[in-house]
Amino acid sequence: MNVLEFQSLCNSISDEVARLLVEVLKAPEDFKASDGNCALCIMNAAGETSMRLYGNNPVRQRQTAFNAHKKALQVWLTGYATGTFEKLVYTDQVSEKQFGLSRPELIGWLGGVEAKTQSGERLILAFSGMRGEQDVGILHQAAEKLKTFSIVKH
């Protein structure tokens, strides 16, 4: 996938997430997490990155963007969804050191996932700004709706 194709896919995913957010943020507990200010980070195997911010408060957007980017980078380095990786580390099934990480660096929150494009290329998606279950849930909903990528299950 070339850079233009990657950017087109990122735009498509970002637009779908924006459509889904309208409904998801109606739940008070999800809106309250960041007052509707959310961030989506998408990466490919080469490290090319796209970020989309949602909401209208730049300070909150910056915070959620930082978290989404940290989630994406952890998945990019490890190949494991956030939450899953931490479970593996803390049960001594995997060492964080083999990925150049230390335990204080681990994000610990759900919302970062490994995915594949239709052609089998690696894609990393991370979302932040709602409850962790919804951060990852909106990515699954976008995958189901678009069919241009699928979430990798570990």
Label each PLM-derived region with a short phrase.
Residues 1-33, 122-154:
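Juxtadomain coupling helices with adjacent low-complexity linkers
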Residues 47, 51-52, 64-66, 73, ...:
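Generic detector of bulky aromatic hydrophobic side chains
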Residues 93-137, 144:
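Sensory/regulatory domains in signal-transduction proteins
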